[in-house]
Amino acid sequence: MPTDHFDLTDRVAVVTGGSRGLGREMVLAFAEHGADVVIASRKLDNCEALAAEVDERFGRRALAVECHVGHWEQVDRLADAAYDEFGRVDILVNNAGMSPLYDSLASVTEALYDKVMDVNLKGVFRLSVVIGERMKADGRGSIVNVSSVAAVRPTPGEVVYAMAKAGVNNLTSSLAKALGPEVRVNCLMPGPFLTDIAQAWDLEAFAETARRTMPLERGGRPHEIVGAALYLASDASSFTTGSVLKVDGGLA
């Protein structure tokens, strides 16, 4: 076994929601461990800035792609762009997501419901199938979905999001069976991480809640997703598929 269990030299990783937050951390970690990366999000300028950083810091190739994963035609274009540029994809991370706020369950419109489902579940299904089938034909690949502890510990303020993320957990198990043995499919289930999104939180109230409800008594630091992501993306997890790995400070 190689000294670096997380070695990704010359592999190609596609990361949706890759320009910020946990996605950004994973992009940088994959590049640091030798991978070329495809950075996808709705904000092309952010993707391009991170692609330039990857090249400057690690000397790896990085392709920026604008993509709204809730629209299948854009998902298909993302897959085609990755294969046109690199000829293959070894790692897919379905990280893009959204959890909009609402005043009450009755205030959730059909448009909002569909938007949350489209981004958090429908797009994950489509991109996993489009790239996963090509991975299977190529004889290898690793898909890493990103759900949330909301899937198993929902709150009233995120019901639709929790439904979608529970679907991602189920989809992970289903795709592991459908795409194996060539392709492994696993899932990260993060708890609360102090990414840029956390700037909108009442951090004092969150800190108090964390002390009461989480064994580690704090939110996650963005870089703390990296170890789990590298494990599932790399050959270190070669006998792991269909698994959901909590990275939540013990919350769930």
Task: Please name every model-derived segment.
Residues V12, S19-G21:
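Conserved glycine-rich cofactor-binding loop
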Residues L44, E66-L78, E110, H223-E224:
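The beta1-alpha1 cofactor-binding region of Rossmann-like NAD(H)/NADP(H)-dependent oxidoreductases
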Residues S128, A164, T172:
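Active-site helix of classical SDR
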Residues S148:
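Residue(s) in the substrate-gating loop at a strand-loop-helix junction
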Residues E133, A176-P181, S238:
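Alpha-helical segment proximal to the catalytic Tyr-Lys
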Residues C187, E208-A236, T240, V247-G249:
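C-terminal helical subdomain
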Residues D103-L105, T109-K115, I143, A198, ...:
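Substrate-binding pocket helix/loop in short-chain dehydrogenase/reductase
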